Design a protein with these regions (language model features):
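Metal-dependent phosphodiesterase/phospholipase catalytic core, i.e.
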Residues: 1-88, 92-93, 125-152
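C-terminal active-site rim and adjoining tail of enzyme catalytic domains
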Residues: 21, 109-196
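Short beta-strand scaffold positions
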Residues: 25, 80-82, 101, 161, ...
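Short, well-structured secondary-structure segments
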Residues: 47, 98-100, 157
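Short beta-strand/turn micro-motifs composed of small residues
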Residues: 50, 103, 160
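Active-site-proximal helices and loops of the catalytic beta/alpha 8
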Residues: 83, 95-98, 188
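Hydrophobic alpha-helical transmembrane segments of multi-pass integral membrane proteins
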Residues: 101-109
Length: 196
């Protein structure tokens, strides 16, 4: 949750919190602390994003890989980054890590889907496409894209979906995951839909 997070009532409870106004229970935890905490409950799968580019992104990748390796979590983590340099660094240094597509790769898969271009097995070097369905000029939230991705062993996850009708639509066309600011609402909506 960031400073601009909105709760169900549209309020932003963390907006403007600085210095001594930040309560102790809002301390930022380390990746290792967060993973250890969640691992106490169940064997979840994770999507972890590296925000930095360049040297800091590479250093973050190195640290993250060590944590994941030490905790035996490599197979249950997808690493994401908007930075092509970080993605290429991951691919070169940690080929056993699962990763998302960077923007040019995502566009390539999209156009392959639209034009029905079949690629050889292993052509796509990424395991998951994490995209907004309609933020760009093109609509990425289609069954055609999802079906093409699945045919090539690529999962499709959409962000940031806070509209319940959109959640249902994406679920119905085969989306593998939905990133949302309201996971409790998404859980209930999709759970009820799956029952119905």
């Amino acid at each position: 949750m960031g400073e601009f997070f909105k709760d169900a009532d549209g309020k932003m409870p963390y907006n403007g919190l600085r210095d001594e106004k930040i309560p102790d229970n809002l301390r930022i935890v380390t990746a290792e602390e967060a993973l250890t905490y969640v691992e106490n409950y169940d064997g979840y799968y994770y999507s972890i994003e590296i925000k930095d580019s360049g040297y800091l992104g590479f250093k973050a990748a190195d640290i993250l890989y060590k944590i994941l390796s030490d905790m035996n979590l490599i197979e249950r983590v997808i690493v994401a980054s908007f930075n092509k340099d970080v993605i290429l660094y991951l691919e070169e240094n940690y080929p056993d890590l699962h990763r998302t597509a960077y923007n040019i790769e995502a566009a390539g898969l999209f156009f392959d889907a639209v034009f029905g271009i079949d690629r050889p097995e292993g052509y796509y070097k990424f395991d998951i496409l994490q995209v907004p369905p309609d933020k760009y000029i093109v609509n990425m939230g289609t069954s055609k894209l999802i079906n093409h991705a699945h045919k090539n062993n690529v999962a499709v996850q959409y962000w940031t979906i806070n509209d319940t009708e959109r959640m249902i639509f994406l679920n119905n066309i085969g989306a593998d995951g939905i990133i949302t600011d309201i996971p409790n609402v998404a859980y209930e909506v999709l759970r009820l839909q799956d029952k119905g």
